[in-house]
Amino acid sequence: MPLPNSYSPSIVNTERADALSTIQGYADKCLDDYFISFLNGFDQASMSMEKSEPILYYYRSAFDRVMDGIENSIVENGTAEIWLLYNMGYIVKTPSGCFAIDISHRWAKELAPYIDFLCVTHKHSDHYNTDLIQAMFDLDKPVLSNYLKDTTYPYTAKGDKDYEIGKFKIRTCITDHNNSGLSNFVTIFQIDCGDDTGNFVFMHVGDSNFKTEQYTNIAPHVNVLIPRYAPNALTENNILGTGAGQVQPDYVLLSHILEMAHAGVDASRWSLDMALERASKINCDQTYVPMWGEKMVWKNGKLN
């Protein structure tokens, strides 16, 4: 089962550490090729695999918790609810809307009826799900990206662009990926979630390479920042500060952890211990490592 609701990424204690260690042990026993076969299998086969493999059972239970939340939660005025689904996939629900970003999940298409728009930072399969994207298009809901459709589609941008969807005001800019040769590949999304959240600002950088000169269309302060665990260690800190192309976040949620389709640490399957160690060195005192299925609530200037 997912971590209990009483747990919080912001409370780092022995009980949580023990739970994360158990999850890591489950993950270590699941090889990448087995996980990929789970992603690509027929529905019935994948559901059977979930019943016999502990980390897949956890993966599905976390999804069910998120689905229940976005379907049934009533968001108080002045607040926002945030879930980590998997890897860098987040869902944010406000009193007046709901969006998702970088959703890569076996059952992702089930989210489509409940989200108003979808953001995709870049064209790598651990950051999108084809079935969810198609379901969104079928429902005539916006999908924001730099590649899915040509620029005649109003939600495609190859560079800086601003959008407004309902009460959400969205700024984007485009940056290089960490991998050499992938220039202008990753879109950064900075989203003001509207006055009914107290103008909560959420920023997600995908697999950006953290080059400040490319962060050209961002506000200098955000409430919650989602960076990846950087292979080029601590370059996450490049974008933290008061200079040009930098932001000052109230909270950082370090992500891209336990990407099960990657073969191991050398292939960027970062462990939970590595994530916690890295989080301790990020230049934001409120830096945490959430786990799949966990919900956080922004209220009165704090994330709990």
Predicted regions and their residues:
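Histidine-centered divalent metal-coordination motifs
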Residues: 116-117, 121-127, 256
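Active-site-proximal loop/helix segments of hydrolase catalytic cores
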Residues: 105, 176-248, 258, 262, ...
